[in-house]
């Protein structure tokens, strides 16, 4: 069944039992908070000390502490030590918790978050690509805002402090503006990668005028948000639903982005395009590729030489058939290619960075074994500091380093699935779950405390997403 032939009845099958009232009621019990986060509604930055935590700094110069303190003032990390004296600071008791950098996602299609009720893993006609391709062109700016907020709310609850919003369904600059407003209003750090709307003609360049308009309106800002482009595939690809452009068109799109000083990201599903991109002179340190599944040793040498980074989405990639390739984390690490970790989507699975690390560890041991060492600490680095390196923001975040911005989380170690704890890195990779995330701090703002949002109205976020989804299905017919 072609994507375009999906009917409203097909999409609504199984989704009509959404039970709006019940969903709102049960989820509100799990997360409660104050008024909806919006411009000016975020918690204030201040001065506080994380006291008595097990500190994993991800900075060799700072080191780790079995028990230590982190001093934060006006959104910046002031000190990390065994003991910090700051009489005027508010104390956050973190005894029995791990304090670590927040997770950094490097590739996530947030606009698809509200499509969960319409997706199915058992019905091919309601698969992710079929549904998103069929409905993408019907999205309004309001839909984008609601869907991005829904995805970011789950990201926040799971311990993310930075998300790369891979927005490959931008019809107009108004649609882009809506997604950026959602990102700003949620208070997380992130990159917004502007990509053509679903079904955009392959023989036409992306909307570079709209991209320039968004850059003028949003950049520079307070360094919480950066901008890039999400490119259509270049050359042959198994995923024809996401666009396949020629090298000449890639030069137009990528050249337009580079003229604006913006980085580029692109999927590499199917036949590897790396040699084609290299021959065309398109690769560089401003390029991020996604899904490292079918690269060769020669291609990886090129990527290292050009400074290209690669994002792996372990949960989604592990669901692909063997013919699509395998996650090549070991090969990337062995070749010295920059790598990072990402969620990809939440339509058919949940946000769980701990699970992502476990998947990578298990697949690595199964396929590679001890030939290429991979420790729990290295995986935590992949999920934090390496993501900052990939997104070009390591000077601001990714580690608990004095002078960097205070993007950090507290993970409870006394919960039944975590205790008793020995090695904190192994506990994070092998045992932890999103429900163990106690506190989330982004740019010095405490966005979650004791497992509850501090300013976000969870019920309102969910209600808006449900209403937008219902209206979308009605418009699609």
Regions of interest found by a model, annotated:
Residues 1-68, 73-76, 381-477:
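Active-site microenvironment of metallo-dependent hydrolases
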Residues 40, 174-300:
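Metal-coordinating catalytic core of metallo-dependent amide/deamination hydrolases
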Residues 53, 70, 75, 96, ...:
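Divalent metal-coordination and catalytic microenvironments
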Residues 114-144, 237-240, 271-286, 302-310, ...:
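Active-site gating loops and adjacent loop-to-helix segments of metal-dependent hydrolytic enzymes
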Residues 116-188, 212-221, 466-468, 474:
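Alpha-helical scaffold segments that flank or form the walls of functional sites
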Residues 312, 319-328, 337:
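A conserved active-site cap/scaffold subdomain adjacent to cofactor or substrate pockets
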Residues 330-415, 431-433:
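His/Asp/Glu-enriched, well-ordered alpha-helical/loop segment
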